[in-house]
């Protein structure tokens, strides 16, 4: 097998024996054949389709990062319209309005290539399998919808088998060898670099085992694989931990690779395992890419599944499940990327007491200024409130410098329930109420009373509290938490920023506090009721606008006594 054909579709001869035991080796899989190569007649077929006004689409297998003006940059999973494939190594393609050259080895042609369809990520074009060569061919139209579905099924099965091989190579080729070198790697380092890759490998073997049971080898279009995704839907959440840890893994690898010993060691591991010629960070990226490709594959499968097919409703449900999984994983990854900002905000608050925000929280959900009365005192006080997951922090503005905040306490949201109150007089506090709500401690019976300036602001706060509880429940479901390494990294970032500004980190400059914002209109963290999560988040390219609260950090002026 040639090792330089990364990303091209393999032929349809597949090894399945003993796959569930994870014992397949490179030697026993050599019958699989090579990836589909766009060379010779294959390239001519592609150009014939292009010149014949057919649309030829390819999916990016790897990220292509370039600064060259005439090259096309893209990310794994992007769909590229191929405009010219005359050169076997470099093709000319288009994404949206951008055109440019890109390496042919970084993409693979989609399973089906139909003539005369409109371009779009959800469009699948026509192709067929040559029964004599077991290779994917292009150029001959397929009228049989069942054959199209069979092509997609075969593609899913093929990629799953190849993915298992990648995971096996990582676990046995790299991780196993690293554990033998205690002089080079500590347990903590291996945990950071490889995360829970072994858990993913075990889960994926069980998933593929069930897929094989549902696969109809004689009539692939009759296969019912939708139930497999539904049965294993909870298992896919283990990818969240891996994706959240991936940035730390890259940083740790980058530090190690500065030492030539580690470069030679990882290269020796690759050669010993007879792995394809890509660096270890490329292999470790595979699970991240894999989880975000499931919705693409299932959407393609659903398109060619008739509504009267026994698998239709299961595939539709599986597509919804996998979209939700990838969206939630993306959301949690975004939250981890924001923890540096939370740490910087805490460092800017004067007179801070107690545990750090990051010990329990990872997301600023909503912020605003309200009047507040605490039961024992019954005194109306104006405070600025910051609602995080698990807790709400109370701050007071400086009398002269209104952009300076002082820490005044916090409320444990895990112990309180929110009570909406109608306008009128409250007997407990003996005050008239308008736009008010309470936080009631279920254990101690303590009560906090809050007054919003307007009814709309009260509604936003009530919605924010519901969002906070929902977020906590979802985090508990998938075991989301900030690792100690990530907390240390955030603390280091704060010290670095403080040092660059020449300000002591213990009294770093606070941000200018913005007026309360509408989270539904200003790009904050609440999602309006009735708007699908898919309209807000995408796995590979989150489009959430940055909260105006954080943007003030870039406009700070040094604080002087």
Curated annotation (Swiss-Prot):
GO terms for molecular function: guanyl-nucleotide exchange factor activity. Residues 53-112 form the SH3 domain. Disulfide bonds: none annotated. The modification Phosphoserine is found at residue 547. Residues 499-524 are annotated as: Disordered. Residues 148-332 form the DH domain. The keyword Phosphoprotein applies. Pfam families: RhoGEF (PF00621), SH3_2 (PF07653), SOS1_NGEF_PH (PF22697). Residues 145-155 are annotated as: Interaction with GPHN. GO terms for biological process: regulation of postsynaptic specialization assembly. Residues 363-470 form the PH domain. Keywords: Cytoplasm, Guanine-nucleotide releasing factor, Phosphoprotein, SH3 domain, Synapse. InterPro entries: ARHGEF9_SH3, DBL_dom_sf, DH_dom, PH-like_dom_sf, PH_domain, SH3-like_dom_sf, SH3_domain, SOS1_NGEF_PH. The keyword Isomerase does not apply. Transmembrane segments: none annotated. One of its GO terms (cellular component) is postsynaptic specialization. It is found in: Cytoplasm; Postsynaptic density. Acts as a guanine nucleotide exchange factor (GEF) for CDC42. Promotes formation of GPHN clusters. Interacts with GPHN. PANTHER family: RHO GUANINE NUCLEOTIDE EXCHANGE FACTOR 4, RHO GUANINE NUCLEOTIDE EXCHANGE FACTOR 9. This is Rho guanine nucleotide exchange factor 9. It comes from Bos taurus (Bovine).
